Regions:
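A basic- and aromatic-enriched beta-loop-alpha substructure that forms the phosphate/nucleotide-
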Residues: 53-59, 64-125
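Glycine-rich phosphate-binding loop signature in dinucleotide/nucleotide-binding domains
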Residues: 20-21, 91, 158-162, 202
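Binuclear metal-dependent phosphoesterase catalytic core
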Residues: 79, 178, 184-204, 211-247
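Active-site neighborhood of phospho(di)ester-bond hydrolases with catalytic His/Asp-centered motifs
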Residues: 5-7, 26-31, 52-57, 82-86, ...
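N-terminal active-site segment of His-dependent metallophosphoesterases
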Residues: 1-54, 59-68, 130-133, 139
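Active-site environment of divalent metal-dependent phosphoester hydrolases
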Residues: 10-16, 33-37, 58-68, 88-91, ...
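Beta-strand-turn-beta hairpins that frame and shape the catalytic cleft
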Residues: 1-4, 88-98, 218-223
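Active-site-proximal loop/helix segment associated with metal-binding centers of metalloenzymes
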Residues: 97-165, 171-181
Length: 247
């Protein structure tokens, strides 16, 4: 099966025309567009192929979690778009596991400091609300969602499958962090150290976004791929508009 892989298209800043390839499935690994825009874009440019869609953090900007989950999941019903949040999709002999993931805020081994830093510098915790009370979305909320997603992923990966692709928005390893940000104190809000987790379960491919620089490397037998377009000022970052990977 051939996968056409994208993340961080950010169509709220600049439109993206989907190129035709020989892919069997399109993967959108988060931050396609804020609110409902990413889903609406995916419907408008559909190339007759099934699309797998997960939320990033930006989908929730000026929206509420989990209300937007319910809204966008409903928008995908009856379309070629499969919305995943702690959900599994089987296509042929390939099992696809998808979730936003968020992070464990433990990349540097100091969760309280990471919570404080993320709360101060990340727009996630300024622009996202929680429904139904519409209180502020906090780093501890993201951490709780992460723990639930990891628990679900682990239970899913324990079940054998011919081929497995994991899709998350947040990065599963510090190896995905661009060199210029290697020591940034906000990194715990971008990546978790799931290297041992990946080594234990060895899915075939782990696709992520959130970083606005491409990544393509292996952890054991698992290929880690990030193909982000990023913001307009980042165009030229190495993004491949027609990236197709076979699993």
């Amino acid at each position: 099966m051939k996968l056409q892989i994208y993340s961080d298209l950010h169509i709220e800043f600049a439109w993206f025309d989907l190129p035709k390839t020989d892919a069997d499935l399109i993967i959108l690994a988060g931050d396609t567009g804020v609110g409902k825009r990413g889903i609406e874009w995916a419907k408008s440019v559909e190339a007759g192929l099934p699309v797998v869609y997960i939320h990033g953090n930006h989908e929730y900007y000026r929206e509420a979690w989990p209300k937007l989950l319910e809204t966008n999941r409903a928008l995908c019903e009856g379309s070629n778009i499969r919305f995943l949040e702690n959900d599994e999709l089987i296509v042929g002999d390939v099992r696809i596991l998808g979730c936003t993931l968020w992070t464990d805020l433990n990349l540097y081994g100091n969760i309280p400091f990471a919570e404080l830093t993320a709360g101060q510098y990340m727009n996630d915790f300024k622009l996202i609300r929680k429904s139904p009370e519409y209180s502020k979305f906090r780093p501890v909320d993201a951490l709780q969602i992460h723990r639930k997603s990891i628990h679900w992923l682990e239970n899913s990966l324990k079940i054998p499958a011919a081929k497995t692709v994991v899709i998350t928005h947040h990065a599963p390893s510090s190896k995905s962090i661009p060199d210029q940000y290697k020591n940034d104190p906000v990194n715990p809000a971008f990546a978790s150290n799931l290297d041992n987790f990946i080594m234990q379960y060895q899915p075939d491919i782990w696709i992520h976004g959130h970083m606005h620089r491409p990544a393509d490397y292996f952890i054991g037998k698992t290929r880690i791929i990030c193909n982000p377009r990023g913001y307009p000022e980042q165009f030229g970052n190495g993004f491949d508009p027609a990236l197709v990977v076979e699993v």
